[in-house]
């Protein structure tokens, strides 16, 4: 409630400023000192209900109302625009109360796209949720008509919201309170464009009546606005949840998906959650869908004045047919599709190439039962991502495991050998480790030095005996560490908090097979790197030995 009062103070002050500006009497705002008397004076002047005036002046919600009143006044005197003034307070509200507010840069991009769809100032644009506040203000400033649907109990006092066009100096606004936080995508054929995003505290939103349970069908598709934008968490592009999978199928199969954009991190105030924009068009002549990756951190909230050129999408990203999207399992992952059409992938598949699964055996690491104290055990070491150095060589693992009798056979099968390669498929996705100079001695059950197994975040690669004439472990290792292949892994990485990559994408990785001489050359370079690294380690140890030890002074 405290944060809501802060926003209402700023909102009301901006409203009075707009009123006084029309009258040419801004000095009266600058001269005001006390918040309570200010509210009573100008609330009555504007014709606000006496209960609303009393609520705004009620100090039980916030004892330092004068601070935010004076802060807003100062921003007005400094020439700060109404939208920037409100957003500065909204950021505080978002941080403390959990209400998500769009960054101004993202809002500018969304508004630019939506306004380009409006034929004239009478065209209605639908926006949903309090998060859309900056989008609404930008559209109103451009003199457009906005229908704003938002959940009940949002931060700004609902009785004040109809005055937003007065604050923005233009536009028309229709307010509708959403029941049960349901945000319709459309439903009014007069709306040329629609903007939908998660509302309030809700993680998801509803498309038409309820797309999670009843995705778009033929009848509801007819109710879609001519052009619509959905802003949602990027996870919706690849989530395996049945409802979201079905939602993607409907968008693709009905050919109403025009573009998919991956936005920079930080699109919402005080949140690292990544957003994606889905642009829908009810009537489309083309069967191609545009994919564009704008996830560069340089475009994040730290540089919040960026603006995605929605009107020039044809010059960015790649186009993928709806047939190809269906064949991919209706995955809308932007990085995957951009990479599939990239120069890097063409480089990887130039000349002779085979899928990784055709060249190596791929084994996913499994947990090994530890000793429960009931019998003899075996000591082993488990390789973690932190055990891989900058060159990709696995140094002596630090994690020791005592394997129980029931886990010995599994441990022996998981043994790492010289030339094995590890790929991280969870967490540090794409990190490559090479097993160098190790020979497990399974006859000694207590010595763990040469008994290494891969941690559960890895898959183990071992060249098939039938393929040793085509490549060496050293060449494959250097190939997997190349920038092009690392970009491939990044494009297949799913998830935000804990990234992961599917086994199918590892297996399908194209491996370029050059001439034998080139492979031998890469193997020689690998060995040269190892020689240099060993020399560096020797010199580092020599430097350490030259350090002064006070105990040696006589």
Predicted regions mapped to residue ranges:
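Long recognition/docking surfaces used for binding and targeting
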Residues: 12-97
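Conserved S-adenosyl-L-methionine
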Residues: 97-203, 208-211, 233-235
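Conserved Class I SAM-dependent methyltransferase catalytic core
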Residues: 202-273, 277-278
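A short glycine-rich beta-alpha junction/loop motif
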Residues: 272, 278, 335, 449-459, ...
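Short, well-ordered beta-strand micro-motif
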Residues: 277-281, 293, 384, 460-463
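Non-catalytic DNA-recognition/assembly elements of restriction-modification systems
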Residues: 312-377, 508, 515-554
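Sequence-specific dsDNA recognition surfaces
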Residues: 357-372, 386-418
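A short beta-sheet element
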Residues: 412-480
């Amino acid at each position: 409630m405290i944060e809501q009062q802060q926003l209402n103070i700023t909102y009301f002050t901006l409203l009075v400023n707009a009123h006084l500006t029309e009258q040419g009497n801004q000095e009266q705002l600058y001269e005001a000192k006390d918040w309570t008397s200010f509210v009573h004076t100008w609330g009555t002047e504007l014709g606000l209900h006496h209960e609303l005036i009393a609520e705004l002046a009620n100090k039980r919600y916030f004892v330092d109302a004068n601070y935010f009143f004076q802060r807003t006044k100062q921003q007005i005197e400094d020439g700060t625009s109404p939208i920037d003034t409100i957003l500065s307070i909204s950021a505080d509200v978002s941080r403390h109360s959990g209400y998500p507010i769009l960054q101004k840069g993202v809002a500018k991009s969304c508004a630019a796209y939506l306004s380009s769809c409006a034929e004239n100032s009478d065209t209605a644009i639908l926006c949903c949720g309090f998060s859309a506040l900056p989008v609404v203000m930008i559209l109103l400033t451009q003199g457009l008509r906005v229908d704003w649907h938002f959940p009940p109990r949002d931060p700004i006092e609902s009785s004040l919201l109809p005055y937003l066009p007065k604050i923005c100096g233009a536009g028309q606004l229709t307010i509708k309170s959403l029941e049960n936080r349901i945000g319709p995508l459309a439903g009014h054929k007069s709306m040329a464009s629609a903007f939908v995003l998660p509302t309030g505290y809700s993680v998801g939103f509803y498309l038409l009546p309820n797309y999670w349970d009843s995705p778009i069908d033929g009848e509801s598709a007819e109710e879609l606005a001519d052009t619509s934008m959905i802003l949602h968490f990027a996870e919706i592009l690849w989530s395996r949840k049945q409802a979201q999978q079905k939602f993607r199928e409907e968008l693709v199969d009905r050919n109403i998906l025009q573009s998919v954009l991956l936005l920079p991190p930080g699109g919402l105030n005080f949140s690292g959650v990544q957003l994606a924009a889905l642009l829908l068009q009810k009537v489309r002549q083309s069967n191609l869908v545009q994919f564009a990756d704008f996830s560069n951190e340089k475009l994040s909230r730290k540089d919040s004045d960026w603006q995605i050129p929605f009107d020039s999408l044809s010059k960015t990203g790649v186009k993928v047919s709806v047939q190809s999207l269906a064949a991919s399992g209706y995955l809308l992952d932007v990085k995957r599709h951009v990479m599939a059409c990239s120069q890097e992938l063409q480089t990887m598949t130039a000349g002779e190439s085979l899928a990784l699964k055709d060249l190596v055996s791929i084994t996913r690491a499994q947990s090994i039962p530890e000793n429960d104290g009931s019998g003899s055990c075996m000591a082993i070491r488990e390789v973690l991502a932190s055990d891989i150095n900058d060159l990709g060589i696995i140094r002596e693992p630090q994690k020791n495991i005592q394997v129980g009798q029931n886990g010995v056979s599994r441990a022996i099968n998981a043994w790492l050998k010289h030339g094995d390669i590890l790929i991280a498929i969870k967490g540090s996705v794409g990190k490559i480790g090479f097993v160098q100079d190790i020979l497990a001695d399974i006859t000694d059950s207590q010595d763990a030095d040469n008994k290494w197994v891969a941690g559960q975040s890895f898959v183990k690669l071992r060249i098939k005996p039938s393929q040793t004439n085509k490549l060496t472990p050293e060449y494959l290792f250097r190939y997997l560490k190349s920038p092009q292949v690392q970009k491939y892994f990044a494009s297949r990485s799913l998830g935000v908090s804990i990234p992961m990559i599917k086994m199918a994408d590892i297996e399908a990785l194209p491996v370029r097979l050059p001439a034998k001489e080139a492979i031998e050359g890469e193997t020689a370079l690998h060995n040269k790197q190892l020689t240099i690294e060993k020399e560096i380690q020797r010199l580092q140890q020599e430097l350490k030995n030259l350090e002064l030890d006070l105990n040696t002074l006589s």
